[in-house]
Swiss-Prot record:
InterPro entries attached to this UniProt entry: KOW, Rib_uL2_dom2, Ribosomal_uL24, Ribosomal_uL24_KOW, Translation_prot_SH3-like_sf
Biological function: One of two assembly initiator proteins, it binds directly to the 5'-end of the 23S rRNA, where it nucleates assembly of the 50S subunit. One of the proteins that surrounds the polypeptide exit tunnel on the outside of the subunit.
Family classification: Belongs to the universal ribosomal protein uL24 family.
The protein's name in its UniProt record: Large ribosomal subunit protein uL24
Self-association and partners: Part of the 50S ribosomal subunit.
GO molecular function: rRNA binding; structural constituent of ribosome
Alphabetized SUPFAM superfamilies for the sequence: Translation proteins SH3-like domain (SSF50104)
Length: 105
């Protein structure tokens, strides 16, 4: 099944501790996505002198389930659901379900 959300999309988080935050999709991993500056967690890292990595506490983005984000509609400024429309030539086009407006060019 094709993903309704792709890398580079502007999204709004609709559930969880970061509800309402907006950001850009950095990575899509199956049914999980990483959103820039959202769901920040602390990770403790060991020092690795061979790689030149200092140890300590590092903050980074953790993944969020894909069902907890909606694509931001620039026209309305809200997060909306995305569906697919099949064109006459057989191509699939992502569209907003509320307005039918196309996401992809």
């Amino acid at each position: 099944m094709a993903n309704r959300i792709k890398k580079g999309d502007q999204v709004v988080v609709n559930a969880g501790k970061d509800k309402g935050k907006q950001g850009e999709i950095v990575r899509v991993d199956g049914d999980r996505v990483v959103v820039a500056n959202v769901n920040i967690v602390k990770r403790h890292t060991k020092p690795n002198p061979q790689a030149g990595v200092a140890g300590g506490v590092v903050e980074r983005e953790a993944s969020i389930h894909i069902s907890n984000v909606n694509v931001l509609n620039p026209a309305s400024g809200k997060g909306e659901r995305v569906g697919f429309k099949v064109l006459e030539d057989g191509r699939k086009l992502r569209v907003f379900r509320s307005s039918g407006e196309a996401l992809d060019a």
